[in-house]
Amino acid sequence: MYTLVLLRHGESAWNKENRFTGWTDVDLSPQGIEEAHRAATLLHDGGYSFDLAYTSVLKRAIRTLWIVLDDLDLMYLPVHHTWRLNERHYGALQGLDKRETTEKFGKDQVQAWRRGYAVRPPALEETDPRHPRFDPRYAGLKKDDLPATESLEDTLARVVPYWNETIVPTLQDGKRILIAAHGNSIRALVKYLDGVPDDVITGLNIPTGFPLVYELDDDLHPIRHYYLGDEEEIRRATESVASQTATKK
C-alpha cells in the first residue's frame, strides 16, 4: 500500500478578500499561516512523515509547504516545484471580486466559470500585464503551454501527465510524498484518481489547510481517502469555499 497526502494551501490574501486568484501570486493571509501550522500539527499527531514534496511555483502553496516542513523538522527534504501544479488559470476574472462578478454576470454564469468542467472563463489578452508570458518564472515554457484561461479539464490535462511521469515513479519507489497545491489542481488529481464523473466533480470543494490522505493499492488505485482534522471544522471550511459567490441579501 502507498500513502499520499494532498494539501491545499492555507487561506491566501485574495481568498480572504474573496477574489478570483488563479495564477496571481498572492501570499498567505494571517489565517492562512495559522492553517498551515494546523496542518503540520495534524500530520505530526497522525504520525505522518515524508521523503519528498511537490508544490507549484506560486508562493501561497510554497509558503504553506515551508511552514509544514519546518514544523515537522523536515526542511531538508527535496522539494520539486512545477507550474503544472499551479491553480487553474482564471483568465480575465483574476483579481475580480467573486460576489460582485456574480451580481454582474449572474449566478449560473459565474458558477459555470468556477465549477464547470469544460467551461473556460474569458481569456486574458496577450497584451494584458497579467498574462503569464510577462512573468519570468514561466520564461522557459513554450508559448502553447502558457494559458490565458483554463477550464478544470485544461488543468487536469497538465496535472495528470506530471502525476504519471514524475510522481508515480517516486511513489512506486516507496517514497512518502506530500503535495502542497491548490484547490483546482487538487480537484483535477482527485477526479483522475477516483474516476469522478464530469458532472459530479463540479460539486467537489477542497478546504484550505486540511491534509487529504489517500491510501493507494499496489496499482495506485485508491483504497480510501480521508481528511485529517475535526469533521465539523472540515465541513464548515468546505461550505465556505462553496459559498464564495453567494450574493449579498
Curated annotation (Swiss-Prot):
Pathway: Carbohydrate degradation; glycolysis; pyruvate from D-glyceraldehyde 3-phosphate: step 3/5. Its EC number is 5.4.2.11. GO terms for biological process: gluconeogenesis; glycolytic process. HAMAP family: PGAM_GpmA. This is 2,3-bisphosphoglycerate-dependent phosphoglycerate mutase. GO terms for molecular function: phosphoglycerate mutase activity. It comes from the Archaea. Belongs to the phosphoglycerate mutase family. BPG-dependent PGAM subfamily. PROSITE patterns: PG_MUTASE. Pfam families: His_Phos_1 (PF00300). CDD domains: HP_PGM_like. It catalyses: (2R)-2-phosphoglycerate = (2R)-3-phosphoglycerate. The gene is gpmA. The record marks 182 as: Transition state stabilizer. Catalyzes the interconversion of 2-phosphoglycerate and 3-phosphoglycerate. The active site is at residues 9, 87. PANTHER family: PHOSPHOGLYCERATE MUTASE. Keywords: Gluconeogenesis, Glycolysis, Isomerase. The keyword Isomerase applies.
